A protein has these predicted regions:
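Peripheral/terminal regions associated with large enzymatic or DNA-binding modules
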Residues: 1-91, 95-264, 268
Length: 268
């Protein structure tokens, strides 16, 4: 489980992409491929910046789509990269990351990659409930992470097998626009450009969970874009900036199981 790529998702916001890529340059990374996926827009400024960007930690690949996919199709197309990688760390261009994000992502992926209960790994920790705008503070445990039945779009890891299970479900469900899925009333109202509502619905319908850190390794700058009409600051979460040792306390699922420290290989 060492074949993990960092994938940045861009459209027409060169300043946002620059901010994200500069945060990646400050991260604790030994060697990792970087893929910059750019949807078709009315400017080639983003493509020029991406092509000129120097990535010192390994291979860099720029994907430029010849037609406009739109946010939903663009994000879902990233899953195709899992034909070539064991996992991908997906970062939209309005995200920035903490220095330890990659070490955490790799360790969590190694630990949870064979757990069928897990649909993905979040780098972000919610400071509030974004449906009610009320404060949210997950009940602390002796571990570094917790489980929540909410998919993540503000910095997340997709693993090959869990993503394929989701995408097979998505292909069978997308045509009815979630009409047959109960208990997701607040997400059904999201527009058809949203891919996230399908991943959330999948977690609820199939009883899957995302792994969340108690301290964020990513934050959302919420720049003006497809789902944000003006720049926002409410989605920013404090980043875990202190140096993290390369050992994490991950609980097996469910929480009552014994603690297990991440090893070199995925569980068999």
């Amino acid at each position: 489980m060492e074949n993990i790529a960092i994938v940045t998702v861009a459209y027409n916001r060169v300043k946002s992409l620059s901010r994200l890529l500069n945060s990646l340059l400050c991260a604790d990374i030994d060697n990792a491929p970087l893929i910059i996926s750019i949807d078709k827009s009315n400017t080639n400024e983003v493509e020029r910046y991406a092509n000129d960007f120097i990535w010192p930690y390994g291979e860099k690949k720029v994907i430029t789509h010849k037609e406009n996919l739109g946010l939903r199709k663009h994000i879902l197309s990233i899953g195709q990269l899992l034909d070539y990688y064991d996992a991908v760390i997906v970062l939209e261009d309005d995200i920035i990351v903490a220095p330890g994000f990659y070490k955490f992502a790799v360790a969590a992926t190694k630990f949870y990659c064979n757990d069928n209960n897990i649909a993905g790994i979040s780098l972000y920790n919610y400071p509030f409930n974004y449906q009610t705008f009320e404060p949210f503070d997950a009940l602390k445990s002796e571990y570094d992470v917790y489980f929540m039945q909410i998919a993540m779009s503000w910095g997340q890891v997709w693993m090959r097998d869990s993503w394929r299970r989701f995408y097979n479900w998505y292909e069978q469900t997308k045509h009815n626009k979630l009409a047959c899925i109960n208990n997701i009333y607040c997400f059904k109202e999201w527009g058809e450009k949203s891919w996230l509502k399908y991943h959330i619905a999948y977690c609820i319908d199939q009883n899957k969970y995302f792994v969340y850190p108690y301290s964020s390794y990513s934050t959302n700058c919420a720049d003006k874009g497809t789902h944000v009409t003006t720049n926002l600051f409410v989605f920013q979460s404090p980043l875990k900036w202190s140096k993290q040792e390369n050992t994490y306390r991950f609980p097996t699922f469910p929480n009552r199981s014994e603690e297990r420290r991440v090893g070199k290989e995925c569980r068999s």
